[in-house]
């Protein structure tokens, strides 16, 4: 779920309930770090991601030279997106892929993940 704060709920309780409902329906991840998120929002979303079993993502919202104050790979020009976010996504993808192979041993599809970031 990108830009979860933009769901524009009236308060944090409503936002939390909406994110929980989405997680219950199969949501995989939530954008915890974003260039518009204050530290208190990052902490809140991080806690909710843990509580609801969601992967964590982050982004700078970099869209090129039209936003000079935003740097690629950094949120708020000082916070880097943790490598652990990427590693957790890769681990879940590998687990799903392995589960698929166990359920369907004849599956010929493969997953290739380049971890040279």
Describe the residue ranges of each PLM region:
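Charged catalytic cores and adjacent phosphate/nucleic-acid-binding surfaces used
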Residues: 1-117
């Amino acid at each position: 779920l990108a830009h979860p704060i933009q769901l524009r709920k009236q308060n944090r309780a409503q936002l939390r309930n909406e994110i929980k409902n989405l997680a219950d329906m199969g949501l995989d991840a939530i954008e915890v770090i974003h260039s518009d998120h204050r530290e208190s929002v990052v902490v809140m979303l991080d806690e909710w991601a843990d509580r609801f079993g969601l992967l964590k993502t982050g982004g700078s919202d970099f869209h090129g030279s039209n936003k000079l104050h935003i740097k690629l790979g950094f949120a708020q020009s000082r916070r880097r997106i943790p490598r652990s976010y990427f590693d957790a996504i890769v681990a879940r993808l590998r687990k799903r892929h392995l589960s698929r192979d166990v359920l369907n041993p004849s599956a010929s599809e493969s997953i290739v993940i380049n971890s040279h970031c």
